[in-house]
Amino acid sequence: LDLSFLLILPLWALYIGRNLPHYFALLGLPQDPRLLQGPYPFLLGLLAATGLFLSVLLHEVGHALAARRYGVATRRITLWLLGGVAQMERIPREPMKELVIALAGPLVSLLLFLLFRALPWEAGALGFLGRYLALVNLGLALFNLLPALPLDGGRVYRALLALRKP
């Protein structure tokens, strides 16, 4: 864990907690006044922020597992202020392997989106966490698929170009 991660987690938790009414509205949930008082906003914010960073970690683990399948070791996974990175020993020379490794992280995020979206939690703290983490994982997948390096989408684009190269 990078020091910036340890600094941002409580700040993100506080931000989410202070804006819970807006999040409930955004997620289409009825507001529960009990969750907006006392320690509950910060605790919900802390759970949501922790879920966000665990989602980023699982996204990066997806890359690491796909890389290992192709014999590419992952030196480390680092979580920091702006997300995470799986540092691999090398980039595979075969474009198809790079493509699979690049798509593995967004695929994990999409699977997490589907999992959280499928949960039967309709309201309250669990409803908030389920819908928040569904939205976060969908956003994580879509953002990472933007075709710009160093994002996964940039690596996908590079691999696709290499596959088309004569």
What feature does the model see in each segment?
Residues 1-166:
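Hydrophobic transmembrane alpha-helices and their immediate loop junctions
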